[in-house]
Amino acid sequence: MVNLYNEEELARIEKIKETNDKLEEFFNNKRAEWTSNVEPLFDVIKNNINLESFSKVVEAQSIALSFRQNINEQISFFLNKRSKEEVKIKKVKQDKFMFYALGVGLKTSLGEKNTLIDAHIAENERNIQLIENYVEFLRSTSKNLEALGFTIKNKKK
């Protein structure tokens, strides 16, 4: 049986897995943080807006705008990270294709090569999926904050 993973490749995959596990925990914590920061803003509009609550409403509107800007910056940052990871994947795919086409001594079809390559890049793809899930969460949170702004605007009328 041919060994398809040398020690260097196993170490590379393990390092990415550890990074992904930390990234997943980081994103879970950030989701919880965003949720706890945003929820109180929605509590402000649960009651009718009157003169007493008006300053809280204006403050909530201001905070929501600030959060949306923060979210947009985070989205850009993580989309850039995703882009860099996609470049890494293309390089690994190329290297592994050459390995399976020329170096391993196995006769494989293109589909079989792709299956073998997919196993090598699974953790890289997990990294991209984690980033995409977090970016989607941020986009959803931003839309909710935008809707909050419209709700406040309509209630003030």
Predicted regions and their residues:
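Sequence-level detector for tyrosine residue identity
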Residues: Y5, I13, F26, F54, ...
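Extended, charged low-complexity scaffolding/tethering segments
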Residues: M1-E52
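Prokaryotic Sec-type signal peptides and long signal-anchor helices
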Residues: K30-R31, K46, I71, K81, ...
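Long amphipathic alpha-helical coiled-coil segments
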Residues: L79, S83-K91, E125-K157
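Extended, amphipathic alpha-helical coiled-coil scaffold segments used for oligomerization/tethering
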Residues: L51-V58, S83-Q129
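Long, heptad-repeat alpha-helical coiled-coil rods/stalks that form the central scaffolding/linker segments
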Residues: Q61-A64, R68, I75, G103, ...
